[in-house]
Amino acid sequence: MPQVKVVLVEPRVDGNVGAVARSMANFGFTELCMVRPCELTDEAFKRAKHAGYILREAQVVQSFEEAVADCFHVVGTSGIVTAGEKHYIRIPLTPREFADRLEGVEEKVAVVFGPEDT
């Protein structure tokens, strides 16, 4: 299993950041990087529950490029279905398909979320 880095781009709701940290801990992931995040208040730590350490140890950077500089693979997430002519390839995968694709990968993988309004 590769080392997985979760990258949050411009998170605006600190409670959501806490929920991400909690989910990360539940699945054994510990590396969180945030690009220009909101301030983390007590709400983030309440939502994180046992995963406050992930919030305390999170890397904060000012650019997306800086966030993924140490990653060999970068995977974006989206709930938006696009139509029309695009200049990139979007290949939707289920979580199971994504896990299967990572089998045998040893390099660091960034899984990118955000911004929350896109």
Locate each region found by the language model:
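Post-transcriptional modification and biogenesis factors for structured RNAs
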Residues: 1-118
